[in-house]
Amino acid sequence: MKIKDLNKYYDKLQLEYGEPTLSSIYNGGCENNPDICFVFMNPTGKNVASTKEWKGRRSPWIGTKNIWKLFYNVGLIEKELFDKIQSMKATEWDEEFADYVYSKVEEKKFYITNLGKCTQIDARPLPDSVLKQYLELLYKEIDIIKPKKIIVFGNQVSTIFLGKKICVKSVRKEEFKIEINKKEYPVYAVFYPIGNGMRNIDLAIEDIKYIMNK
């Protein structure tokens, strides 16, 4: 099975749980044993790749700015690309530039995905019951790419992914283990660094640097 083989399942779930005028957002980056797999919550309409008019890749954070501050500050994108992203309006991203950005993500050996692939019109929280519909698909995704380390963002995603109650501020830099298809992966829970979580971005950066160097 390949990563793209999962997309049809995400598209079906989008119709059930997402905004019907928007498309599902999948994933992107290094698909072959990346150094880190970053697992966020779910996409919103701020991602310009979620529009029906978009013809290119449907990867996380296309057309946004703040998350790239995190990736720049942990050394995963170069300053030239970061400055270009910060200078661009969302509508200035096109399919070619999105491919270029993700080619750089791939070069740096990291992978970006969300637990929930159902795009919402805004950043409203999703109930656990919806995110859990995607859990087995995320496990399949991880089994395909086989990352060296997994970073999950925020209490809700960390709790669902690990199957135990997680409070990120209490487990900073702590390594958990998860077994997927008989292979064990190290997992770290990190503060969610976007939206209301922007106040914690410096703590997220600190923890990710620690995890990368461990």
Where are these predicted regions, by residue range?
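A polyanion-binding, active-site-adjacent surface
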Residues: K2-K149, N155-K164, V168, Y185-P186, ...
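A hydrophobic alpha-helix/topogenic segment detector
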Residues: E16, R172-K214
